UniProtKB/Swiss-Prot annotation:
Residues 80-83 are annotated as: G3. Residues 173-175 are annotated as: G5. It comes from the Bacteria. It comes from Ehrlichia ruminantium (strain Welgevonden). This is Putative elongation factor Tu-like protein.
Length: 228
């Protein structure tokens, strides 16, 4: 149950297709459910996030998915955005709801076309804060390569108007965090490390005195292979 007394933050995962956004979303809910079970957290499995038949069949996120989790200090509503270029409109819908974004970048690939586009679109829709999760670090043994990927990401963030030199970059593996039985494992600790900068994000000013406004969204699967 959500504790309405806690400050609320809207966050979400953005980035290139197959870099691990949905896996990270599942890992966040799972690790927090283990570490802070008394905070109303519930583990959400990967296939519960990408639950539409076409998403399961193709192994990609098409529509935005929503989960919730909490720390001792804050409540988070999390939007998992699609990374495929064909569903960029759905990504924009999700990003427009965010106070802060978690940019997911694979350590094996570095910045890819949708990495760049998602940073640009996040800036254009008014996402003020970005935290970087460098994923799949378990399969990269070369520290120099990890440093090069981090440098590339920081330069890209700076190019699109974010303070690239100051943004937190957390290196981890969402898959390994999900596989760990103990919530105190090394990869689960990386998930908690990711939460630290999110806990420090300035709380947005909510316009409580203005008329109520909310977004309405849906994805219609009426053509094979195409979402509208």
């Amino acid at each position: 149950m959500v504790d309405g007394r806690k400050p609320h933050i809207n966050v979400g995962t953005i980035g290139h297709v197959d870099h691990g956004k949905t896996t990270l979303t599942a890992a966040l809910t799972t690790v927090l459910a283990k570490r802070l079970s008394g905070e109303g957290n519930k583990s959400v499995k990967y296939d519960e996030i990408d639950k539409a038949p076409e998403e399961k069949a193709r192994g990609i996120t098409i529509s935005t998915a929503h989960v919730e989790y909490e720390t001792e200090n804050r409540h988070y509503a999390h939007v998992d955005c699609p990374g495929h270029a064909d569903y960029i409109k759905n990504m924009i819908t999700g990003a427009a709801q965010m106070d802060a974004a978690i940019l997911v970048v694979s350590a094996t690939d570095g910045a890819m076309p949708q990495t760049r586009e998602h940073i640009l679109l996040a800036k254009q829709v008014g996402v003020k804060d970005i935290v970087v999760w460098m994923n799949k670090c378990d399969v990269v043994d070369d520290e120099e390569m990890l440093s090069l990927v981090e440098m590339e990401i920081r330069e890209l963030l700076t190019k699109y108007g974010y303070p690239g030199d100051d943004i937190d970059v957390v290196k981890g593996s969402a898959v390994k965090a999900l596989e760990e039985e103990s919530a105190d494992g090394v990869w689960s600790e990386k998930i908690m490390e990711l939460m630290n900068p999110l806990e420090k994000i300035d709380l947005p000013i909510r316009e409580k005195d203005n008329p109520f406004v909310r977004s309405i969204e849906d994805v219609m699967f009426n053509t094979p292979g195409e979402a509208q």
